[in-house]
From Swiss-Prot:
Lineage: Bacteria, Pseudomonadati, Pseudomonadota, Gammaproteobacteria, Pseudomonadales
BP GO terms, sorted: 4-amino-4-deoxy-alpha-L-arabinopyranosyl undecaprenyl phosphate biosynthetic process; lipid A biosynthetic process; lipopolysaccharide biosynthetic process; response to antibiotic
Taxonomic source organism: Pseudomonas syringae pv. syringae (strain B728a)
Protein's UniProt name: Probable 4-deoxy-4-formamido-L-arabinose-phosphoundecaprenol deformylase ArnD
Job description of the protein: Catalyzes the deformylation of 4-deoxy-4-formamido-L-arabinose-phosphoundecaprenol to 4-amino-4-deoxy-L-arabinose-phosphoundecaprenol. The modified arabinose is attached to lipid A and is required for resistance to polymyxin and cationic antimicrobial peptides.
PANTHER family: 4-DEOXY-4-FORMAMIDO-L-ARABINOSE-PHOSPHOUNDECAPRENOL DEFORMYLASE ARND-RELATED, GLYCOSYL TRANSFERASE-RELATED
Length: 293
């Protein structure tokens, strides 16, 4: 059973500490994945103002966020300027590339995108993508081939903005199957590879403890579905690293074979069905996100 393995890298600490550990774990398991990197300033601590929202406050309590992520991540970019991730830690991104993993853009400013993508102008959306693409392509030494919107904050405007960058595919939404979004002019856009499996932080809480997560998530894979799983360098690369190592071992025993997302694309991309990305909601995740329709 083939499955896509996606690793989102949102923060400075996730890049500095989580990525090297994940690369070692993946090398041990002989597994390749897709890394989506945030490359601009780490301003993730600015999400703390969202604690006034009951859904976000409950998510932080449910996942025990301070223990899960660490205070340096939760406070990054609040009382001081956010550290420039790509400028300081670009060699770790090249290390992932040299190890044979697929590399794509997550965001220039992860917090900025997640907080503002829903109301930025078309020009602002394009400028944010442009900054991220320019930075990551300079780091890698070649064009960026894929992207994944931070926090799955994507809709048809985001889809349209990304068309100018010539990506091979995007992974901007939650959904159940590969598709090509229908654009405003009636043409079909860049292929989308949705995520169909929940993330660790979406399901951990009073009814599911961390040590039971592997049983839960491995039970969600099925032969007749997409099977795209997302992990975070800030979680599975740090505090839950041992759990991820065991997940890979058990997945292999169950016949689940992980691969970079790009390997899920068919040879004839033009034959993929059409679809849309609309704003929706998902249990365990605060705020809106892009969903396949």
């Amino acid at each position: 059973m083939q499955a896509g393995l996606r690793i989102d890298v949102d923060t400075y600490r996730g890049t500095r500490e989580g990525v090297p550990r994940l690369l070692d774990i993946l090398d041990e398991a002989q597994v390749k994945a897709t890394f989506f990197f945030s490359v601009g300033p780490d301003n993730m601590g600015r999400h703390l103002w969202r604690l006034v929202r009951p859904t976000f406050f409950w998510k932080m309590l449910r996942s025990n966020a301070a223990s899960l992520y660490g205070w340096d991540i939760l406070l990054a970019g609040t009382a001081w300027p956010g550290k420039p991730i790509g400028r300081d830690l670009g060699p770790l991104m090249r290390r992932a590339l040299d190890a044979g993993h697929e590399i794509g853009l997550h965001a220039w400013d992860h917090h900025g995108w997640q907080a503002n993508a829903g109301h930025w102008s078309d020009r602002q959306l394009t400028a944010q993508i442009h900054r991220g693409v320019d930075c990551l392509s300079d780091i890698l030494g070649h064009p960026v081939v894929c992207s994944a919107a931070a926090g799955w904050r994507a809709d048809q405007r985001v889809v349209q903005a990304k068309e100018a960058f010539g990506f091979r595919y995007n992974s901007d939404c939650r959904g159940a199957s590969l598709f090509r979004p229908l654009l405003a002019d009636g043409s079909l856009g860049t292929a989308q590879i949705p995520v169909d499996l929940p993330t660790f932080d979406e399901v951990i809480g009073p009814h599911l403890k961390p040590d039971a997560f592997n049983d839960y998530i491995l039970g969600r894979f099925a032969a007749r579905q997409l099977n795209v799983y997302t992990l975070h360098a800030e979680v599975e690369g740090i505090i839950m690293a041992d759990g991820f190592r065991q997940l890979l071992k058990r997945a292999n025993t169950q016949g689940i074979h992980f691969a970079p997302l790009g390997h899920l694309l068919p040879d004839a991309i033009e034959r993929l069905p059409s679809g849309h990305i609309v704003r929706g909601h998902l249990p365990g995740r605060e705020g809106w996100l892009g969903v396949q329709q």
